[in-house]
Amino acid sequence: MIGFLAEKLNAFKLAYLHVMRADFFGLQKGDVETIARANYKGVLIGNMGYTADEADAAIAAGKLDAVAFGTSFLANPDLPARIQAKAALNAPDSTTFYTPGAKGYTDYATM
């Protein structure tokens, strides 16, 4: 499924295609990023649970052009500095994601 879609999206000359490793709908089996890369000619961004080392490896191998860090950024406002320092990451509290108020937005510890 992702291969077919990625190939068809080439015609639209998108700025990038953002794919997630997780398959919530059970439609794609196996490695989504490799299939997308084989069929999509533009910039490919991956996401979903990457560690810094996995992101580096995927980019170095040409599998992805960039990796997005969603949940990791929510829990680590200083994520780039933590990655650079190889520091431990804060555990995210999913009960505070996208909720009103400051809890979960301004109270995570920084280095």
Language model regions located:
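Flavin-dependent oxidoreductase catalytic cores
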Residues: 1-111
